[in-house]
């Protein structure tokens, strides 16, 4: 069975296990912090971008003009990743705390997640259990 596990299957299994652990933590009222979700999301997008190129290079002969297309597609993939990341940052009620704007307040042992955009911004405060896990229930909200 181990001979059929490629590096991409192992990575996809790790990403799936992360999401399953997040949902199991959700049963106990806990969640991962945006730090872990941001790394997870970037790793998933990077893996989804690299896998087709590895398949392409395994089935084709190397030519220099492919590098130009790879660089251009890398730029387009980065823009798509940023747009999806920005979308998740502005969704007011998301079960996944993927966010651009968050602050850890160590004195009060809480994390502030800023949701929304410009005119309708919401600051959600969550208690931190440890630096990587927070309580999923919002402690209090401040709306601007």
Stretches with model-predicted labels:
Residues 12, 57, 102-103, 125, ...:
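Sequence-level detector for tyrosine residue identity
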Residues 86-111:
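Alpha-helical transmembrane signal-anchor/signal-peptide segments
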Residues 2, 106-108, 112-144:
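Extracytosolic and intramembrane catalytic regions of membrane-associated proteins
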Residues 55, 67, 74, 125-128:
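Short amphipathic alpha-helical "recognition" segments used for binding
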Residues 1-6, 31-33, 55-69:
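Membrane-interface helix-boundary motifs at transmembrane edges
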Residues 9-58:
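Membrane-embedded alpha-helical segments of integral membrane proteins
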Residues 62-92:
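Internal/C-terminal transmembrane anchor helices
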